[in-house]
Amino acid sequence: MYIDTSASSRMTDNKGSVITINGGESAGNSPPSQRKSSTSESPPELRILCFDLTYYNRTTQFLLSCAGVFFLYILYGYLQELIFTVEGFKPYGWFLTLVQFGYYIGFGLVERRLEGYRISGGSFWNIEPEPRCIPMRTYLILAALTLGTMGLSNSSLGYLNYPTQVIFKCCKLIPVLVGSILIQGKRYGLLDFAAATCMCIGLAWFTLADSQMTPNFNLLGVAMISGALLCDAAIGNVQEKAMREFKAPSSEVVFYSYGLGFVYLFVIMLVTGNFFSGFAFCLEHPVETFGYGFLFSLSGYLGIQFVLALVRSSGAPIAATVTTARKAVTIAFSFVLFSKPFTLQYLWSGLIVVLGIYLNVYSKRNKLTLADVRQRIKQFGAKVARSPSRKFLIEV
């Protein structure tokens, strides 16, 4: 799910501005210029579903968003791995994706009705959702990419350790950077390439350790999660262009992307015959599949809302840092809650990936080119040459 960061810049422009109830009442007796100033200082709206966090201070908004991200996505990862521990479930990752998409359709309908109820009021069940903003042909592309991302990601767990899957997800910068250079002709700074290099080294080391420690390691899982990353990287470009051009709310994008993705996958599974075998297996284990699948889907859907709120309140770099920390905690929980072999190579390679993510976040605020590096080296050399200690050492 791509996250639009335009709201975060609006938040930065209005930081520290809070309007009290008394101030709002006194605005009616103020001159027009004062009323205009009061309106312009209103903080940007921040909502998580039907909960309005607009008039909380920024620290409270940040803490609430962080708490939601950590709790929901740690629960999401735990339930995802728990479902795949059910004996005989590993071949049915695509059916889990179908169940997840079905739940997302229901959640999306409820969210769109909540938005309509908040805007127009009236009876909740008689609310008509807002008309679609983005053309259907764009959603057909988004649905295919969403299906590739979620389906390949879920199915890869049948062949990979969960920590390995998470490490791959941390390295989405690599396909994004390569695709942006080849397709859009973008230019990146030195820190971006350093970040991608660290991620590649850490990822290769982690995968090598996993292949040595895990007896059921399969390169098909690596291919699946790599395909999921490529689809996820493409989703960002398509969603960014569509949401900015047509001013579509995120609830609409989620609803149509997963709704059409459900139709795609349902037809494919009917044609291949995998639907009936997956459905029969889930009927034999309804709690472990449909029950856990509901909580798994609900935590993922709500997690998207909290990440969006975190981006709007604190900005994309901070949101990226928080989600990276969440992934590190998820990996730690995976080793603690599910028995699996461990080696220190996991730790060191994971730290290299984290370094790459930090460099990527740092580069968003501090653009560094090769010319900047040469300039700083010259400045450092000149400073050392003028240093008294340097002169003393030469004289000795």
From Swiss-Prot:
Record field: compositional bias (Polar residues): 27-42
Keywords: Developmental protein, Glycoprotein, Golgi apparatus, Membrane, Phosphoprotein, Transmembrane, Transmembrane helix, Transport
Membrane topology label: Multi-pass membrane protein
Database matches in InterPro entries: SCL35B1-4/HUT1
Keyword DNA repair included in the entry's annotation: no
Localization of this protein: Golgi apparatus membrane
UniProt protein name: Adenosine 3'-phospho 5'-phosphosulfate transporter 2
Lineage of source species: Eukaryota, Metazoa, Ecdysozoa, Arthropoda, Hexapoda
Encoding gene per record: Papst2
